[in-house]
Amino acid sequence: MDNKLEKMKKLVEELNQYAYEYYVLDNPSISDKEYDLKYDELVILEKETQVTLPYSPTQRVGDKILGEFSKYTHKGRLWSLDKAQNMEQLIEWHNRNLKVIEQYNSMSEDKLPELRYIVTKKFDGLTVNCTYDENGILIKSATRGTGIIGEDITAQIKTIKTVPLKIKNNHVIEVHGEAIMTKTAFEEYNKAAQVPLKNLRNGAAGALRNLDIKETARRNLSAFFYDVGYNEGPEFKSYREMMNFIRNMGLPQDKYIKECTNMEEVEKEIEYIESIREELDYDIDGAVIVVDDIKTREILGYTIKFPKWAIAYKFEAKEITTKLLDVEWNVGRSGRVTPTALLEPVELGGVTVKRATLNNMDDIKRKNVKLGAKVLVRRSNDVIPEIMGVVEESLEESKEIQAPDRCPYCNSHLVQNGVHYYCENTLSCKPQMVKSIVHFASREAMNIAGFSGKTAEQLFERLDIKSISDLYKIRKEELLTLDKFGDKKSQNLIDAIENSKNCDLASFIYALGIPNVGKKTANDLVMKFKTLESIKNTTIEQLVEVPDVGEIVAKSIYDFFEDEKIISNIEELLNLGVKPYYEEERIDENPFMGKTIVVTGSLNNYSRGEIKDKLQSLGAKVSSSVSKNTDYVLVGEKPGSKYEKAIELGVKVINEEEFSNKIK
């Protein structure tokens, strides 16, 4: 029995260390298979001995559903933070601190040091308090609650794999952190969720307030820790020392921690945090600025609600509520009919928002969105805002959104395929034909210079262009009948159409508008199969062998080339003189061949598209995110969080000059 217990202790220590390496350091030292074997061995030993250590990894997810939440009194108070909405308010706070310190130093021989601040991100999640006992074992986790009394969420916190169940510490401490849901976890959860989550914060809060622990685990939460609220061990002299302690205990901690000695430096860091906000895989809603020196904190003291030595700088909201006035149905080039929400105008992120995305009727029903109701709107980057959910209290006088049964443009009957509605009138439905022609003529496709959406509309309405192949039948005399088409413009378009006949195969494949096939996938298909005939006759099994092509994309490609009408149109294009060609490019040996490269920041000699093309021409794979599998990160001016991630993981970083020298 003793041998088995010793073996269990060893396995638990090993598995917890492996989990720390995998989830926190992102640097695993063993394979998943080896981990699983050790985990299974531990499960067997626990069954045999009927003993389970409180910090065993098997205790992270239980089968039971809890009856209710119990209260927990925090050993140390969890304070709220005062807020600054602009730099003027932040400078006022700084000046108050200076005044108190000057007064103290004028009256005391034990002088306080010059003010130094620590700037960190303000995470938009749920504040949690984790208590570790004198043996380093996690014995309690709780919500902030009133700051004095919270709710016990120990079982829920144990589902967060980055939170250690045991730390190497021999005195009681309480550690404060923020439980968050990453964008990656949010998207994965919503793919299979019957009721999709509205936003990341609700996802995290709902998980920790759920009595079904398995549901909490399904949310796949993360956490960052940033404060020791109660400590029976040696006192800290500075916040930097406290943060080092938190990190050394193996608690997950954000890498961004900046020291500042004046407000100019603080402002610069705030601007930087805001600039990388959208690149992060989690939500932040501001920056936190705290006094570093602990004794100075004691002198500054507290108000009834806030510590005077800390403040939060709040960024502009990315979400807001407004009224849904109506729904507009639009037709894409594939014939898919999609809804767009028409909103009561509202300011969000410095922009007046009047429209928002509603993906499909299934999305509308799951989110319970109704006409006249108040909806939660989110805007990320510069993309069209999306409706994330509805304010339940506003539903009383709202009306159901009705799915259309006819095309809003050509009045044809719609057919339902999965969650989407389609107009099958491909020949005379204006939006479909116009968008298909514009896509076919675009720069990355057939590159027909001087072609525009307005030109496509005139070709459809005035020259009766009903298919892509009809483009190659247009005569100059016909173009002269169109608005704003003189002799020169007409001849230029005729020449551009003629010149497009000699095109590379990847551009032709992309121009065809195969569902789910972008330019990269088109390039990958050509690299794999070499000829149009081979691509047309390939199987789903062969298609999934192409990099980044899964079963859904493979089926889209296969079904596309099974359509007799499409094959007929392709044959007509070839008969009209379109000659797609493929020349296997010989790539000379170079340092980037076969390497995975991430680009961040602005480059002097390349646009983002140009550097991507250049790297691919060198045989490199261009990735959008940094991981331990990244070979190089090419850094330009004002790099984002990808640069920090590269430094953290030890990935080779090169600038534009070094890149140019390597390819000479």
From Swiss-Prot:
Alphabetic keyword roster: DNA damage, DNA repair, DNA replication, Ligase, Magnesium, Manganese, Metal-binding, NAD, Zinc
GO cellular component terms listed in the entry, alphabetical order: cytosol
InterPro entries: BRCT_dom, BRCT_dom_sf, DisA/LigA_HHH, DNA_ligase, DNA_ligase_CS, DNAligase_adenylation, DNAligase_N, Hlx-hairpin-Hlx_DNA-bd_motif
Binding site for NAD(+): D32, K33, E34, Y35, D36, S80, L81, R144, E178, K314
Disulfide-bond pairs as recorded: none
Biological process (GO), any one: DNA repair
MF annotations from Gene Ontology: DNA binding; DNA ligase (NAD+) activity; metal ion binding
CDD domains on file: BRCT_DNA_ligase_like, H3TH_FEN1-XPG-like, LIGANc
The protein's enzyme class: ligase
Pfam name, any one: HHH_2
SMART domains for this protein: BRCT, HhH1, LIGANc
Cofactor requirement: Mg(2+); Mn(2+)
Segments forming domain BRCT: 587-664
Assigned EC number: 6.5.1.2
Catalytic activity from the UniProt record: NAD(+) + (deoxyribonucleotide)n-3'-hydroxyl + 5'-phospho-(deoxyribonucleotide)m = (deoxyribonucleotide)n+m + AMP + beta-nicotinamide D-nucleotide
Binding site for Zn(2+): C407, C410, C423, C429
Active site: K122 (n6-amp-lysine intermediate)
Function: DNA ligase that catalyzes the formation of phosphodiester linkages between 5'-phosphoryl and 3'-hydroxyl groups in double-stranded DNA using NAD as a coenzyme and as the energy source for the reaction. It is essential for DNA replication and repair of damaged DNA.
Family: Belongs to the NAD-dependent DNA ligase family. LigA subfamily.
Name assigned to this protein: DNA ligase
Organism: Clostridium botulinum (strain 657 / Type Ba4)
